[in-house]
Amino acid sequence: MTVKGCLCLAFGVTLIVIVGVVVAMGVALSKGRAPGDDLVTLALNELAGDEDVVGRLSDAGAANLTGLLRGLILDHLSRNSSGLVAADALYERVLTRLRLDIFVFNGLVAAFNGFWLSFIIMYTCARTVRSGKKVAPAPIHSPPTMMSPYI
């Protein structure tokens, strides 16, 4: 393999690393949230501070907890929907910004890792080419099977 081959190999590995991370982050970025998840979380946070709600929850016990929570949340949402809708819009903007920041950060990390990986490949390959050794892949040996005479 020549130095040109080493450069092509390093460039290919770098490109594969960066494209893989971009595709993975693009999929993660495009996934939306379930509708109303943050509204329920906000309602639960507001309900946790209410002594009446805490008392009703402790009286109910664990058996009817899910149904009681659902009823309390729906009741709370029906009474305080305007503030929660505004908070939901703010939450959505913050979440979108955070996803974008994570995407950019991971893209920079992928570029950095791709650079160092290509540098290691180029350095190792160039040393081998310079020393005059052949750079060739190792021969592929099939694993022994039941029909193999070596078993």
From Swiss-Prot:
Q: Where in the cell is it found?
A: Membrane
Protein name as it appears in the record: Putative membrane protein ORF10
**Which UniProt keyword terms apply here?**
Membrane, Transmembrane, Transmembrane helix
UniProt gene name: ORF10
GO CC, any one term: membrane
Instruction: Answer yes or no on keyword Lipoprotein.
Output: no
From what organism does this protein derive?
Ictalurid herpesvirus 1 (strain Auburn)
Transmembrane residues, as ranges?
7-23, 107-123
Where does it primarily localize? membrane
Phylogenetic classification of the source organism: Viruses, Duplodnaviria, Heunggongvirae, Peploviricota, Herviviricetes
Q: How does it sit in the membrane?
A: Multi-pass membrane protein
Q: Does the keyword Transmembrane helix apply?
A: yes
